[in-house]
Amino acid sequence: MRRVSQPPPRPRHRRRRRRDVLPSLPRASMVFLIAGGVGMAYLAARTPALAGLIGLAPPPALGAPGSSVPPAGARDAGEGWGLGETARVLTRQGLVLRQVTVTGRDLTAGRDILGAIGVPQGGPLLAIDPETVRTRLEALPWVASARVERRLPDQVHVAITEREPMALWQHNGAFAVIDREGRAIAADPGRWRTLPLVVGAGAPGHAAELLNLLTSQPGIAERVKAATLIGERRWTLRLDSIENGLVVRLPEEDPSAALDQLVQIDARDHLLSKNLSVIDMRLPGRLVVRLAEDGPVDPEAEIAGGKPARGAPAGGQKPPPIVRKSEGRDA
């Protein structure tokens, strides 16, 4: 029997305010130059006409004031045009990173975005490869997708789509935040204790179906505190309290119809307001209840077998009869 536990307490701290413009970047220990920036500087060195077209001044001629002397063994000026000189050329042209703008950021830390860019303020703008930055961003916990643009002369724009936390998943005594695709998010579960709690192996892959089902019955949904997936086939709901709340055992087939019937019965007989511990709807056409004084409840106990009660309605045309567990067979 799995034990449904309370989620960890939410830490008391203020949430970091969002910054959509990140003008100040931390100084990195290294500047990573991409082949594009190096290639453009190389072409500027070899072809002055092309340098004018792309907005780069060609390097000064060897021997002229301010020129660089190629290293020993270099065959021509192009081979002597190193990474450091490329960075200086780009800086002289004003193509340096001065500002980062971000849209779509809510849960992703600004420092993580700057770290993915990897070039400090004042570094060469052409040293930033948008595709490489996009890959780094999409590896962050909250980022589902990202788009990166270099905007001349001095700006990088980042547009991200974040993953939406859907539920807390408890498995083997541990908690994790999951999104609508059932993927775990590397986030502090204590910050999301108000999310629905799903329990059991395979629960993340079926959680979206459950929440869509509950959306159709908001009166039930607002009372659900936990849902346990049994055998990756059906759900058992805990209402009002995780520890000792009302247990509702849904059937494997057509749980939506079962919830509809439960709402109808509650409207007629105020069933959910009675002193019950279990409402069992696993058998078609039959609803079994257990009074709270009948003893503790195992929310994951399975029905070994059994047939619908004689004369039970077929096809869910009207609410099934209510049978107390002590009066009817619960095989």
From Swiss-Prot:
InterPro entries: Cell_div_FtsQ/DivIB_C, FtsQ, FtsQ_C_sf, POTRA, POTRA_FtsQ_type. It is a single-pass type II membrane protein. Residues 1-21, 297-331 are annotated as: Disordered. Residues 46-331 are periplasmic. Residues 304-317 have a biased composition (Low complexity). The chain crosses the membrane at residues 25-45. It comes from the Bacteria. Pfam families: FtsQ_DivIB_C, POTRA_1. Keywords: Cell cycle, Cell division, Cell inner membrane, Cell membrane, Membrane, Transmembrane, Transmembrane helix. GO terms for biological process: cell septum assembly; FtsZ-dependent cytokinesis. Residues 1-24 are cytoplasmic. Coiled coil: none annotated. Residues 95-163 form the POTRA domain. Gene3D superfamilies: Cell division protein FtsQ/DivIB, membrane protein fhac. It is found in: Cell inner membrane. Residues 10-19 have a biased composition (Basic residues). One of its GO terms (cellular component) is plasma membrane. Essential cell division protein. PANTHER family: CELL DIVISION PROTEIN FTSQ. This is Cell division protein FtsQ. It comes from Rhodospirillum rubrum (strain ATCC 11170 / ATH 1.1.1 / DSM 467 / LMG 4362 / NCIMB 8255 / S1). The lineage of its organism: Bacteria, Pseudomonadati, Pseudomonadota, Alphaproteobacteria, Rhodospirillales.
